[in-house]
Amino acid sequence: MTARHIFTATASFFILCAQATAADRVVYKGDVGPGQGKHILFIASDHEYRGEETCPSIARIMAKRYGFKCTVLFGQTEAGLIKPGSSLIPGIEEIEKADMLFLFLRFVHPEDAWMEKFEEYLKRGGPVIGLRTTTHAFNGLKGKYAYHNYNGGDDDFVGGFGRQVLGETWNPGLGAGHYGRNHKFATAMHTVPAQNEHPVMRGVKEMHAMAGAYSARPMPNSTILATNRVLESMEVGAKPLEDKAPQPAAWVRTYRFKGGEEGRAFCSTQGASEDILSEGVRRMIINATLWCMKMEDSIKADADISFVGPYNPTTFNFKPSITDAKPGDIEGYDTPILKPKKER
C-alpha cells in the first residue's frame, strides 16, 4: 500500500469516527442573540415524563431565539436509538466546554468515567437546571460515586446529587413525593407574591402543568419562587383541591460541591413535555436558564419564547413514545419533536 493510500484510508477512518460521534447527539447553533459564544448542554434520560421531548424543544428556543449553541444528549441503546431512562448517555465530554447544564434525568447510573466528568463540572460551580425527576437523577451507582444516588446516606451528602445540588431528592416518607393522583389531577403553579420581581418570574403569568404535583421541602438556602395547587381534573382552569395545601414547585439556590466554586441552580418539580405547552411554565424555565448563567439583563418579560419547529408532545407514561428514533432525526429547526401526532 502506498503512502497516499495509507493517508486516504486514515483520513476516511477519522471522518467516519467523527460522523459516528456526531450521530449520537444533536446540536442547534444560534446565529444572533445574547447567548453567542455560550454553550448549553442538555441531558435527557427519564423513564416517564418525556425529557427527550422537553430538552430538544427548549434547546431549539435557546438557540434560535437567544443565539446559544445547544447540545442535547440522550439515553440510548447500544445501537444508538433514543431510549428514555437508559444509563448509556454518550457525549458527556461536551460538559468540558459547557457554560450551562440542563438536566432531565431519572434513576440513571452511568459508568465511572461519565460521573468523573460530571463531577468536574460541579466542582467548577457550573450552573445547573434540574426538572421534575432530576431530584432523583441517580440510582444504582456503585463504588466511589454511590453517594450521588437519590437515597445517598453519606452524612455530608444526604439525599445525593438531587438534595445537595438542586435542593431536593425523592423521599415520600419525608415529604418529597407525589402529591395528589398523578395522571388524574393536573397542577397549577403560582408565583410566590414576594418573588414577583425575581428575574426568573419576569413575564410569567398563568402556569398549568399536565403532570401531577409533587410535595417538596427544599434545602434551607433555597428561594421558593412558585408553589403548586393540585387540581380536581386535568383540565385547564379546573378548581384546586381544598385539602391539598400549596407546595414548593420551583426554587433557586446556590450550591458548592466538595469545596469547589459556588454555582447557581434552579429546580422545578414540573417540566414534563406537555407541561411546557403552557407559556408560563416554558417562560419560567427559559428565564431560569438565563438566570443560572447570571444573564438577568437578557431576561425580557415579552421575549419571544414560541416553539421552533413542530412540537407535538406525547402524554407521559412509562411506555416509551418512540422506539426507533435517533438523535439525528431531530436535527435542524424544522423536524418534528419527536414525531407528529397521527391525524384523528
Question: What are the roles of these predicted feature ranges?
Answer:
Residues S45-E48, K184-M189, E197, M201, ...:
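Active-site rim elements
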Residues A23-G35, T54, K64-R65, E93, ...:
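Extracellular ligand-binding/catalytic regions of CAZymes and related secreted enzymes
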Residues M1-H5:
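Positively charged n-region of N-terminal signal peptides that target proteins for export
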Residues T8-Q19:
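Bacterial N-terminal signal peptides
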Residues Q36-G37, L131-A238, A301-R344:
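An acidic, glycine-rich "communication" segment
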Residues Q36, T54-I58, E94, W114-F118, ...:
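Stable alpha-helical elements in mature extracytoplasmic
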Residues V26-K29, L41-I43, H47-F138:
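Helical hinge/lid and interdomain linker segments adjacent to catalytic or ligand-binding clefts
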Residues P127-I129, T223, R264:
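Proline-centered loop/turn at the N-terminus of a beta-strand
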